[in-house]
Amino acid sequence: MTFTQHFNSATLLKKKIIDDKLCFLEFKVENWKGHIPGQYSEICLTAENGYQAIRPYSIASTPQKDTVSFLIEKIDEGEVSNFLYDYSLAGDKFQISNPIGLRFILHNIKTPIFIASGSGIAPFLSMSKYLQEKKLSFFTYHWSRNITGLINFDEYFLRLNKYYFPFITREIPVGWKGGIERIKEENFNNLDINQGYEIYICGSDSFVEKALSVISNLSLDSEIYTERFGS
């Protein structure tokens, strides 16, 4: 592959293992000029024999930073995610694309609602950091199989409090006071049906379809935007 201006050279600065599936990667990217919350970039791996593999990942970092971060979920037989999780080291070189996509960006005209499953929280990490800096309100609903999958749980719980709703569906820790059920209409009883919202949903295809079904029954004044794994 001959790279165009679409891709830039990048150096891995930091790698943080979260659990047996998730990790954060932070890169320094040449000519990085920031992004709009909700955009993604493509990460390219190049083998010694010239073989290349490219995968898209939502940008999880604050838009104003001169570095860019991604939340990586290790997928069974995932060519890129397995390498990034298992073998990448600080100092490694990659190619990372300029920010892509305007379909799932933060509009911030009405009150945002973020609905995520698992690593689908990634674009909302960027969006929420931006909104917190602007001191603007938003709601976050996050479903995870375990406590470690609730990325930034302590920070969210401290800062957002009544606007943050975490759910654990499998490995429920002792003393857990959050939700334990899968997504249903009752989870959103705290929303004011007379207020306008912009709703963002990110997760697996089955989760997004279920969330759309639930939201459609709430009769909210809202615009809905979706992002699905692999789409």
Q: Predicted regions span which residues?
A:
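FNR/FR-type flavoprotein reductase catalytic core
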Residues: F3, E77-S231
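Ferredoxin-reductase
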Residues: T2-A90, R145-N146
